[in-house]
Amino acid sequence: DGAAAAIYSDRTGVYVGSGGGNYQNQYDYFPLMTEAEDDLPTFGAELSNNVNPMWLLRTLPNNVLGHIGIRHLLKGPNACLTNHSVGGTLAVIEAAEALRNGEADRAVAVGHDAPIEPQMVLYYQRMGLIASGALLPFDARHDGSLFGEGAAALMLETEAAAASRGATVLGEILGGGYACEAEGLVAIRDDGDGVL
């Protein structure tokens, strides 16, 4: 009924993690940047004449969060986390915390990204993170990773919410955590200070 649907909608959260968004849409204004030659007033005055007015909205990583909420009428707590390759994992951790803290009865956690863009490949290659040949994640000869597009969603709910619909509980998230050592994108402090 309508009342139950409203409660479901208000008590269902959405947590989305991504690597950061679609940078190719920012290419629209690169020619204008070159022409303006660091003259910000000129750049600002000509921006609306040279760039699609939706360019910024097309690049936002929280678009996925918005579309999920709108499509499924989910109005509970939500967050968009952009943190390179761990964004999806952070979304699961945040969704589980929302359930544990009583902010929601259920939450969908989503991870997505499509980082295959020239500047990202170059950036990761210069850091030595791109495999020189085949991807060999479990081989002693592995020497990096490869980019790929992907998305996954996981529906989490409290034990009480599962019981109310007669669902079998398949697993439990006991905890999760993350840290920032401010040492760089992939660096970890020798003393592991931020991890402990």
Where is each model-derived feature located?
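Active-site-proximal alpha-helical scaffold in enzymes
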Residues: 1-3, 61-72, 78-110, 147-167
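Short, hinge-like loop/turn segments at secondary-structure boundaries
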Residues: 32-33, 124-128
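Short acidic, glycine/serine/threonine-rich loops at helix termini
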Residues: 25-29, 92, 117-123, 183-186
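Condensing-enzyme catalytic core mediating Claisen C-C bond formation in acyl metabolism
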Residues: 130-196
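Short glycine-aspartate micro-motif
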Residues: 11-15, 104-109, 135, 170
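Flexible, glycine/proline-enriched loop segments at strand-loop-helix junctions
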Residues: 49-57, 78-86, 142-146, 185-186
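Acidic, glycine-rich active-site loops and adjacent beta-strand->loop/helix elements
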Residues: 18-21, 83-87, 111-116, 175-180
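Conserved beta-ketoacyl condensing-enzyme motif
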Residues: 1-72, 77, 112-118
